[in-house]
Each structure stands twice: as structure tokens, then as C-alpha cells.
Amino acid sequence: MDDNYRIFNKNLITNAARRGTPQVCTGNGGFEPQPFDKEYVLQKNKIEECITKTLQSIGDGRISASAYDTAWIALIKDVINRDLPLFPWSLEWIVSNQLRDGSWGDRDFFVPCDRLLSTLACVVALSTWNVHPNETERGILFVKENISKLEDGDDVHTTLGFEILFPALLERARNLGIEGLPYDDPTTQKICAERDLKLDRISKELIINEVPASLLLILEGLENLNWENILKLQSPDGSFLGSPATTAFVFMETKDESCLSYLKKTVQNFGGGAPSLYPVDILTRLLAVDRLQRLGISRFFHSQIEDCLSYIYRFWTGNGVFSGRDSEFCDVNDTSMAFRLLRLHGYNVSPNVFTNFKKGDEFSVYGDDEVVDSPSTMLNLYRASEVRFAGETILEEAKEFSHNFLQQRQGLPNQVLDNCLISKNLHTEIKYELETPWFASLPRLEARFFIERYNAVDEVCIGKSLYRLPDTNEGTYLELAKLDYNRCQEQHQMEWNHMQQWYEDCNLEEFGISKNDILEAHFLAAASIFEAERSGERVAWVKTQILSHILSTYYFIKQSHQDHKPQLSTEKAHIAGQPGKGFKNVQRIISILFEALTQMKKDALEGSNGDISDDLLHEAWGGWLKKLGEGETEERQEAELIARTINVCGGHILSKQILSHHEYKTLSQLTNQICHNLHNSKMIGKEMENEMQLLVQLVLQESSNGISKAIKQTFLVVAKAFYYRAYFSAKQIENHVSIILFEQLV
């Protein structure tokens, strides 16, 4: 092979051989996949059942309760007896959930803004009804002793609207005559000054006539509002952007019955408490699908994922989506995640939704003047922009903006800290995405990275208070991902042993092939088509890649033109070897090819992939050899040959009719062109990007009377493997091979 591809040193080959599991080879050069052991099956089924139940019961989405929002609901007075709370059980929830240090807020993660705002809100609620004085005093003491922590260090994890909401609550506390709070503390004065500056920037026109989403979430911190106009922005469920605190405030001011219905339902569902956002049905489904896909275990939950995506698509609008259904407003974070996942699964979604968030040269959170300043949000926008089709200018602009933003944050110390998410691995995740474009990100490469850095269990979202999403924060996702990864890796190692045996038995070294070449081909196949049950397709990929290379490099085959139907046989082909290569060697490589094709068919049949005609594989090779013999080397057909072999062995192509389909021909030609250029030039420029975008469009877009998704996906899989090989250096590929194929996950 090309010297540039002789990348693996002898130590890697030696170590690979040592680490491989015992091989299971048949006597005729075939490969027998390792059966699943009972312990693995039982463990896998148990975890899978648990995750399935969770996915099927998402409903409105589970979310942790918020002391801040609960306190606002506890402030509501009974409509008949104004001296009593309308939601007394919310007061009981507050008392039951005070932390040991006297504060309220997230129990496991201390963020000063969250603790101080939540504690102050609970103090105001308890003082309003003059109940539980001991708990109230402990809360007051906590605020007084910890207000200075807002000045400690660079706390980027500032909760949403803190500089507006905290002073507003302090004013309520002052009006109630609550003593002991740090009203005149220098830190408090600084926060109030920030509040005044922000309010000065908000024009009276916006507040009175057109409230942007960024302000709608913090209405409880504002004054002199036009309630008639604000009520026009109410969601169908009665809430305001799914915020219980804001909705409680609106009800106190307007007595709107829809607000009350929403609050009653929420408090009932949360046992007296209330979350920071509700519902979170869209966000929960987005995170579930995204994590299952990136962890490499989505195939176990195909129907559940389709249900989730179908649900999300029901609420997809020309403006995008929000974390909860039927929202009057949409945000760029949820819209980016939804766009990417829906497009990848064949849904018709327009990139024009992102024009709603474009403000000049920047992108905003809600489509208003609040520019995105969150690395996690910008990462989702960047990932969405990577699945663009040719000519989608708005996604090019989104990619340029998000890429520059993320690069700048990566280069500054502590600037990857996020104001929407607390995640210890966000920095490394951004680094991976910037260094590994989607076209070069093979499934096993992404899964390995994501599994090793998966910390969803510890992730905390930042709104007006901190919150968690239990449906997607469970450790079962990671448990299944590790179990499946190691099982697939065992299978890949057994296949590697088989490929080494095949290499020795066929004496491929005589044809200029090294074990390094076999290992590289095996890695590309295993990293692209990783599922343990698809062993036959991987082995077919490797043998096709190796044998086509031998034939195209060392021999020129002139097909007899006497037959209209090309036949793959030593008798019908005129074979002329290179100097020093005898006719017997040519006969032997053709014999090896015949044996390989026979075994491919057998493996496919044993894999229950349906009946496979000998003609499908033989004619694929016959056509390829004929074109090679006619001198058609300018546009090599290797990629299409690999793709067709995979599709035949995978049971996706069962008749020759599909090969003459216009869509199939277009995909074949484009894939061959892309892979030929990547193989020869190793340069990835604008033209290559455009060709890949066109291929992605052909693969992902639904078409009437088109070929199956599985067939189309195979072309993209092969093209991405060629892209990967051209994009990464020899040293990087060597490292990937070692990690992905031979280092077990623990």
C-alpha cells in the first residue's frame, strides 16, 4: 500500500496480537462470530429494560424541585381568606427541604447565587405567613454570612437574572420588616447598582409593549408592567415560558385562572414543591436521544428513539423549539439539538429557523438582543451547523461564529466555565469537537471519547436556580455503554485474529501487503461498523479493501469484450502481470478472491441477512475488474465496491434492480469521486467540503420511491472512513487504533 499508510510500528502489531482473544476460525478461511455469553445477555437485558421503561415514561419530563420557585408559589394568598396561603403544602415543602447550614438550594453543588437567591426567597415566604421562626432565622443568618462569597473569585455560574431577582426579593423583605438581612452590605449595593444599569438598558417600550423572552423569565423582578400585553404571551398550559415562579407572580398580579391551573398541576406533581422549569418534555427527549446515540447504544432503543423524535417533531415550528412544548418562544440551544437530531434521522427541518437567532454578526439566545455567552449552547449550535447541506448559508454563518467563539474560549483560562451548565468535562468535549469534524468522527471514536468523559450523572443545569434532569442523569446509560463497548471490542479483537490468520494462509505479504495494512483496514471497518452482530460486514469490508488494492496496484486485467455480461473468472480474463510477477501468482490472487466471495456469502446467510445470490458479489467484482481493465483508473471504483459489498453482505441489496436506480447511481458516482480525491490528494478544501455536504444531503433527505436508508447510510459510512484517513496524521491514527481496538474500558 501507499507508504503514507504504513503507519503502525512493529510494537503495535505485536501488542495487538498478544491482546487479541482466542480466535474462532473455520477450516476454510471463514470466521465464526463469538456467541453472546449468558452473563452478558442477562446483564444487558436488565439494564436495557430499565432504560426502556424510563424512555417510555418520560411524559412531561422529570426535573428536580426548586426552592426558589416553590417559595414564590408559597407567597400566593388564598382567594377567599387572604390571611391564609393558597398552597400551604408548599410552605411545608420549604421547611422539609432546608439544608443543614440553614440555606436552601442544590444540596450537592454550592453556587453562591443559587443558595443566596433560594434562601432569601424562602425566608420571605416563611416571614410573609409568620411561621417557622427558627428556620427563618437560620436562613437569615446564612444570607448574612455568605453574601460576601459573591465576591470570591470569578464565579461564572451566575444564575439567570440574579442581579434583577435578588434586589427585588430584598425589597420585599424590607417591606415585610425582616431584620438581620444585609441590606446595606457593600456586596448588596454592588448588585443593586448592576440591577439599575441593566434596567436602564431596558427601554420602556420593551417593558410596556413587547417583552422579550429574556425578560419574560424574570418578570417577578420587574415593575410597572403592562399586564394586558404580557398575558398575550401566555403559553397554552397557562405558564410563562414554563417558569412556576414567573407564573406565580403573574397570578398574584392578575388572578388569571390559567395561571392557577398550571400552578395547581405543578404543585400536585411535585408534592408541594415546584421545579425551575416545567414541563421539560422536549429537552428531556433531546438529551436522551443525543446521549444514547453518542454512547453508541442507540440501536437497542430504536422504537423508543423514534417515538421521542416523532414527539419533538410535532412541536417543531418555523421558529424552532423550547425545552417545553407549545411555547410562544424558542431558544437556540434546544433548537440546535433538535435540528441536528431530526435531520440526522431524516426529518424535514429547515435551517432557516436559525435566522430567527441571527442578530447582525452574532447569534442570540431567544431571538432578542441577548447574545449567546454560553460555551455549551454554542457547542450545540456548532454541532448543528456540521450537518448542513450544500448551499445552506445560514449554517455556514452559524459554524463560523460558533467555531470562533469556542476557539477563543478554549484559549482563555477559566473561560470555558458555563452560565447554563455545570460540567467538569465541557472543556475536553469542546476540544474534541473542534479537533474532530463530524465528517472525520467515526462512531467508535466518538463513543469511546464520550464514554470515558461521560458525567451526566453529575451535570447540573443553571436557570434561575440549579436543577437536574433525572431521566437523563442516570448511570444506567453509561453502564450499558461500557458493557456493550467491551463486548464489541472482544468481537473486533477476534476478527483481528482471524484477519491475521487469513493474511498468513494467503501469504499476502508476497503481494506487498503488510500486517499493518490489514490492521488499518480492520480498524476503519470496526470503527465505522462496530456492532458485534455485523461481523460479516466488517470482514467483507477488510477483504474487499485489501484485495481490490492488490489487483489495482499490481495487475492490469483486460476483460474480454466478447461477452456482454462481465464474468469474474480466470478463464475469461486476459491477465498481464507486472515484470517479475508470474501467471501463477495472478491465478492465486484470483483464487483468493473467489474463496473470499464464497465465504462472504456464507457469512451473510449465517447472519440471517436473507438469501444472497452469487451474482450480486461476483458481478460487483466483475464490473469493477472490467472497468479497471479498460483503464478507468482516473475515477477509481473502490469506494462503491466496498459499499456494495457491505450492503450485499448486510442483506440490504437482494436484487440487481436496485443497482440501476437513479439514486443509487448518483450516490455511487459521488462517493467514488469523494473517496478517490481523498485517497490521492489528502487535501481537504472547500470543494471537498461541498461534495461531502452534497453526499450528506443525498443520504439524509427522504425521497419518494427512493432506495432504503440502510443502503444510503453505507455510502456515507465509507466516505467518512476515507475522510478520517485523510484528515488525521499517521501518529493520531496509530493512537486511535491502540485505544479503540485494544484498550478495555473500565
UniProtKB/Swiss-Prot annotation:
A motif (DXDD motif) lies at residues 331-334. Mostly expressed in stems, and, at low levels, in roots and leaves, but barely in flowers. One of its GO terms (cellular component) is chloroplast. GO terms for biological process: gibberellin biosynthetic process; terpene metabolic process. SUPFAM superfamilies: Terpenoid cyclases/Protein prenyltransferases (SSF48239), Terpenoid synthases (SSF48576). GO terms for molecular function: magnesium ion binding; terpene synthase activity. Belongs to the terpene synthase family. Tpsc subfamily. The Asp-Xaa-Asp-Asp (DXDD) motif is important for the catalytic activity, presumably through binding to Mg(2+). This is Probably inactive copalyl diphosphate synthase 3. The gene is CPS3.
